[in-house]
Structures are given as C-alpha cells and as structure tokens.
C-alpha cells in the first residue's frame, strides 16, 4: 500500500503539497491588494479596523474579510516594524486561522506570523490568546508585536505569573492577550474557585494560537495543573525511611519477558524503560523489619494492611528518589531547596514540586528542609484545557513527527509550510563510539577544529551533568566557551545573542534558549550606527565562509522531534550550517531501547577503542528505538486522556453548577428546591410510603431532623393524629422555612442571599476537593482489577460515576445542613464569609513523566476555606421565654435558643 501511495504522491503530490498550492491562490489575492494599502494614509489604514468590525456586525464572516485583513496587517507591519510578511508567512497565517498547526522552521518568523490570525480573529471582540512557553517570550512578543496591533487600534494585554488579579482582569479584556500556558490554565482553575463573577479574570475562551505547540500540547500533555492545599506533615517518616534505603540492594537479572533469570537476588528491581522501581518479596520482608526497628510499624502487622498504604507510598517514593532521580540531571540544590530541571528545556522550574511524596523524598535524600505535601483542590490537564477553546491553532518548527497525535487528540491537522529560502543545512551522519569517554573526547576534538576555523559551535546536551562534564573537558583543552544550563539561566539571552559569533562555542542543555534565534555574526543592536552595521556584516560574512553554525548533539534524545529541534537551530533563513550527533553504546537510549546485539555487532565490524563507525544498520536501530519511545509516550498520553476525560465530564458539571450560582444574585429559589429534594430523600430513607407503617423509623427520622437540621417537630404526635405523608412533608418544609425566614429577618434579605450563595459555593468546593482525592485513590488502585479479568477503564468509569452521583447528593444535603444549623453572632459581619481564605493554598503544576515525574508549580493564591462564618445581628433578638419562631410551639430557650 505504501508503494502505491508513494507513486501517487509523485504523480499528484502529497496532500500537504496540494494544500499549499491552494493556499498560494489566497496569498496572491492578498498581494494584489498591496498597492492599494500602500496608497492609504496612516489614518486611513487605522480606520480599516473599525470598517471590518462594522462589516462583521452586518453579518459578514471573518473568512470573507481575511484577504483584506491580512493585507492591512502586512502593511501595518511594514510601517511600524519595517518587517514585511513573506508569502510563506501569509500561508502560515491562513493555516492558523483555519484552526490547524503550521510547521515552520527556525528563523521563519513565527512571531510575526501570529499577528495575521490574531488581528483577524480579534475583530469580533471575543479576544485572542497567543500562548508562549515562558514569561520572557510573552513579554517580548507583546512589546514587539504590540506596536503593530496598537497602530491598528487593537489593545494588547500581557499575563505573567506575578500579576495581581485586578491587573489580570484588565489584561484579559484586551483584544489580544499574550500569556504562558501555565498562567492561562491556573487562571481558569482560580476562576472556578471564585465566589463571585466579579472575582473571575478570564472571559470566553475564543481563539488560541499556541507557539511551540509541540512543547505545550505534546511534551507537557500529561501535565495536570493543580490548585492544592497542604496536608499532614510526614517529615519524620520521610527521614526515617530515607535512612532505610541504603540497606536495600538491587536484584540482578538477565533476559527479558518470560525468560528473566535472577542472577543475584535483591530487594528491588528497576524498570528503566518505564522509570519504575519495584520491591521484591525479599524487599518487602526487609522493609517490614526495618520499619518495626524504627518504630514505624507494629510487630505482627503487615505492610500490606490497608492502614499502611501511606508507608508503602513513602517507601516507593524514597526508592525512586535514590535510584531514578539524579542531582544536576533531574534537579539541582539551590538555596537549601530542591529545584526541578525541565527535561525538555534544561531550565530550572522554580516553585514546582513533584507530587505523591516524591519531592519530599528527594529533600530527605539531599538533607534539605522537607516541606509539606499538598492536597488537590482543583485540577485540569493541558489536553482538556486547550480543548475548551472555540478554535485552537499552533505553530512550531517540529510538528510533523507528531501529526497523528495532533489529529487524534486535538483534531488539528499539521501543515508543513515551505521555507522562505531553501535550507542549505548539511546533516552529517552520526558517529557511534563504544564508550561515553571516547565520545566526549571526539566531541572536544571536533569543537577545537571548528574554533580554529572560526566556525561557531552549539553543543546540545541532555543534562546539566553532561554539560558540565563537556565544559570541564573543553577547559582542559583550553577551548574558550559558554555554558547555558539551569544554573546560568539569568545570562541566557546574552549567551544566545553571541552564540553565532566567530569561533563561539556554546554548550546548551537540551533546548535552552529556544524561541530566540542564533544570528550568525552575533546580534546586531537595534540602534546600531552605520559603522556598527558594516562591522556586523563583515562578521556575518566571515561566519558564513567558515560554514555557519555547527550543531553537535552529544546523544540522541528519546524523541526524533527533540533532535530535529536541536538541528533546527542551524541554517536559519537559508544560511549555511551543519549538524552531527555523537553517540555511544552507553547512552541511555542505546542502552535501554536499542537491540542487545548492538554491542557485539559493532565489535564484529572491527571497532577498536577510540574508533567510530557510521553504519546504516546502527542508524536504523536508533530510529527504531526512538519510534519505540515515541509510541510508548503517545500511549501514555492517550491513556491519561481517557482517564482525565472521565474527570473532565464531572468537572464541567461542577463548574457549570458554580457558574449558575454566581450568575444570579438571588439563590433562594435554588436553595428551596435543594431543601425539598433533601427532605424527600429523608422521607424515602425513614418513612417511605412504599414501606409498611410498622417498618417506618419515625424515631430515627426525628433524631435526624433535630441533630442535622435543627428542626424539632412532634412527628410521632402528628402521625398518631392521622396526618398523612404529604401533609407531614409540608409541615417539615414549613418548619425549616420558618427558621430561615427568621434568620433573614434578623440580618436582612440581601446579606442572607449572599450568605446562602457563599455557603453553597463553599460546600461545592469542599466536597469537590474530597471527591478529587477519592478519584485519585481509585485511579491508583483500579489497575489491580486487571488481575481479576476486569477492564480497569470500565471499572473506573463505573465507580467514578457512582461516586459522582453520591457527591451531588452529599452537596445538597450539606448545603441544607449548613444553612439550617448556622448560628447568629452579634460580633461578626456576614460578608466576611467570602473573605475567609487559606493562605497555604497553592497553584501546582504536576508533570507526570513515565508515571514517575510529577512536578508542581507553586504560587501562593487565595482560596476559600471550609470554616463557616456567622451573622452580625441587626434586629431585636427573640427572648428566651418567647415562642420559638420555627412554629414548634416550644419556648425559644428549649428549641432554637
């Protein structure tokens, strides 16, 4: 079939080729308007924005004005920035406008491309979000491109992590908003924890343009954004278990699958492919003995007992911390804190914390202060957040390898946009060595040779540790260089700006500096003099003669896309450049995923120490290994989405419930409806009409009403007098209503309505939080059902639905209980109920990677507590010997006094 497809592609072109051909027709129409736009004065060009808005109000569509709008933004860009959109940039803009992904190479001007669909889609007044990966890029792009938008009377907002919510409200109302993916997600969660509509910052999620879309929608797809609060302090347990870990030994095994042979029995096994650690039977026995010795486990009590689940989690976290997570690779120690290093960018992730006790276990391992764990209050994945937008689009230099996932998960087609100038980059064959030491020596020699000829070199590493090893090696060889990793992130912009200078050598961890072009000859100052421009041009020409930027990859990444990102740093906009990867059989990818026969095969080919080979068989093995990992990661992301979709459906119901409450000032009718449902349920539980009278539990019903709802009514007397079920129900409702009416008379109608709303929202939030924790436990345990020949996913759906139904019932019951039992205090203002906040609540960004790396970003926010406030009395109180206003006939002191 693939042969037939190849033949057809050669005859009629690929789908991508045909699509680009069609889009060029639209580009030509835009270009035809260029002379008309040039003839307009600045004021006439600016007035086009209002003209377009008027036409949209007259029922024209955005697509009908696309050609004119793109011509306007192109001309405005020339006048304001002296930058003209190339034809391929117009194609990229059309692709984004159509809600697809535009793959455009490094240096093709994606930042400028985004102005096209952003301007067009902001004309309807619903707003456009341009999403970046960090605050620096959001601020830079907003300042830069904002000049064009402002020229055309469009407002531009910037959302960063350190803004107040008042400033965010203003920013979100702008026509075009630049923001990071993290802040957008957190603001969405915070909005859905607000107590009033006025406290929300976001408006409708209309149109999103995601820059570096592969990084956000693929690399961080399994990254739940979490609002959390602190739980119990287990610092002593973490420290005790940390002291136990050195006593455990690794089990040595050989073979694979069913043919595993235990060569040396041990306490744990390591699954490097899935980044997991498992205790063996010996390990469980040893763990129990050590815990008993430490006083953490009682003699004769099994570690498998339900009450010891937390101990098992702590042990597992400690093992992972010691065995799978390395200092200066996965994290660094900074100011007595464990700071996570982003595996995709090499940047530090200040404030983020791994969850499930992993971060605390690493803190214990490194002997720094152990902070409390957090409990989830609200969460959402990037997958489900970005699917909330009416239209989603994205751009990146590397999307084609993940095109299937973009289509399957997000419904986004990937369109490869041709470069403005053909690429002249030379991708040299990989060089493979037997050991890492030999590989590093070869890299040092390559770098030295390039520096002698004046060719700038960018050395890409996968970790801080490797970047510093190579740096040490270069220092020994007297090779001047710069290191760009998490420890030098403050100097990132300066280092990247000079990375293309003559003879420059830059070591960068993974894709640190991504989003900033490396300019050959170094960066030219914006206000450069003529002499400075001439000097820069000479330097630029010298670098071109030396061969342009040379990329040295120190190992293959697990994803081909990440390798392509590194390659894409070279030969921008048709410049010359070259790339080469240096590998060894000790590299993680080769060691874990490549064939076990690789080493012996290479030795059969005659390899000796210090020698390298270039062989198609090895390259195929590497590519197959990468495909394996990509497939595993895709399956993991898809698996997560299946589970999160269940939670997402429930999340939508809860958030809609909150929105409905916040959208009205008077919730009394809603409360009355809830109260009647609860009373009917009580009747069903105690004295149902479907039961025989002798089976009724009148005493239990009486006690429930009295203790839970503060209603003391003579139920048995009424029943003895022949009062039927319907009349009894009516009297109970009237009794509850009378109590609430009295409270309303005491504090006033408006404060009472506000209090009712606050209690409803707090109750929803509290039990939603508890539900999320229960869902987490269910998800962690449901996979064990597979051993009982049950489908874990179906079991999860079935049980979570039952739990959610129970949650909705519980929320209704607790709302009625709270409003029935609330007491009146003369010294407290009712409006304070909304202001009671838990200052310990945090915004957390959990980043599960191969089911182990769960990171979190921590920013102090304010969220409502579960404490219940009371009213300030505004009217005369009832005397203790006066009749109770509930209608029971009793004195107030013996009823509700």
UniProtKB/Swiss-Prot annotation:
GO biological process: intracellular protein transmembrane transport; protein import; protein targeting; protein transport by the Sec complex
Cofactor binding, note field: May bind 1 zinc ion per subunit.
Binding site for Zn(2+): 884, 886, 895-896
GO MF annotation, one: protein-exporting ATPase activity
One GO CC term, this protein: plasma membrane
Biological role: Part of the Sec protein translocase complex. Interacts with the SecYEG preprotein conducting channel. Has a central role in coupling the hydrolysis of ATP to the transfer of proteins into and across the cell membrane, serving as an ATP-driven molecular motor driving the stepwise translocation of polypeptide chains across the membrane.
Entry similarity comment: Belongs to the SecA family.
Protein name: Protein translocase subunit SecA
Gene, per the UniProt record: secA
